[in-house]
């Protein structure tokens, strides 16, 4: 996943 915030 990704961890964009």
UniProtKB/Swiss-Prot annotation:
| Full protein name | Unknown protein from 2D-PAGE from elementary body
Q: Which domain of life is it from?
A: Bacteria
| Note, other | On the 2D-gel the determined pI of this unknown protein is: 4.5, its MW is: 28 kDa.
Q: What lineage is this protein's organism placed in? A: Bacteria, Pseudomonadati, Chlamydiota, Chlamydiia, Chlamydiales
Organism of this sequence: Chlamydia trachomatis serovar L2 (strain ATCC VR-902B / DSM 19102 / 434/Bu)
């Amino acid at each position: 996943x990704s961890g964009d915030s």
